[in-house]
A protein has these predicted regions:
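Structural microenvironment flanking redox-active thiols in thiol-disulfide oxidoreductases
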Residues: 70-115, 126-132
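Positively charged n-region of N-terminal signal peptides that target proteins for export
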Residues: 1-10
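Bacterial N-terminal signal peptides
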Residues: 10-19
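Short pre-active-site segment immediately N-terminal to redox-active cysteine/selenocysteine motifs
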Residues: 53-56, 61-64, 94, 138
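Thiol/disulfide oxidoreductase modules built on the thioredoxin-like
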Residues: 115-118, 125-169
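A short beta-strand-turn-helix
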Residues: 35-56
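Hydrophobic beta-strand anchors of alpha/beta hydrolase catalytic cores
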Residues: 57-58, 87, 142
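N-proximal helix/coil linker or "cap" segments that precede and/or mark the start of modular domains
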Residues: 18-33, 107
Length: 178
């Protein structure tokens, strides 16, 4: 009897772990809030940003990710077309707890951002907690949060032309506001 209870408990725990491993962010769900440091070492609270009733764009990237380096300047161009919409880059390059590696990662990110000549706030997800909350499994991952604070679009990867769908979505928000 004890053995069967143990097997049932073990099966139940396995089911929970399995479901967590395959969890994903779903369109229509509230955007997870988080606290994170910026590249400039300032505090950033997503909960404050969500209060502004405007769409928010999060792009999860890494310095070593080639499609990310292609997407970032394109996102910056799109950002310039939509000045009222907040765009944030979330760096996941240095997922470790080694202080030296974090400093090196910050320098690499700063160098990449300067090289690409983009003007977006960079958030440093050094421990991967934000990427985990947003179920990021592939880079780049682009997430659009609607003015009500809900996930409205999730896109992984980047190929030239992917930005057209983002522009269409953002135009919808701008036209809705008029």
């Amino acid at each position: 009897m004890k053995n069967s209870k143990f097997i049932i408990l073990k099966y139940f725990m396995l089911c929970i772990l399995f479901s967590l491993a395959f969890s994903e962010l779903k369109v229509g769900e509230p955007a997870p809030t988080f606290y994170i440091r910026t590249l400039e070492e300032k505090n950033f609270f997503m909960s404050d940003t969500l209060k502004h009733d405007k769409p928010i764009i999060l792009s999860f990237f890494a310095t070593w990710c080639v499609p990310c380096r292609e997407e970032i300047p394109v996102l910056d161009s799109v950002r310039q077309e939509f000045p009222d919409i907040k765009f944030y880059l979330v760096d996941v390059s240095g997922l470790n707890t080694n202080g030296k590696a974090m400093i090196e990662d910050s320098l690499q990110v700063a160098n990449m951002i300067n090289y690409l000549k983009v003007d977006m706030l960079v958030l440093m997800d050094l421990y991967g907690k934000t990427a985990e909350k947003y179920a990021v499994k592939e880079l780049p991952t682009l997430i659009v949060i609607d003015p009500e604070g809900k996930i409205s679009y999730v896109h992984t990867g980047y190929t030239k032309g992917d930005e057209n769908e983002l522009i269409s979505i953002l135009n919808g928000y701008v036209n809705e506001k008029k």
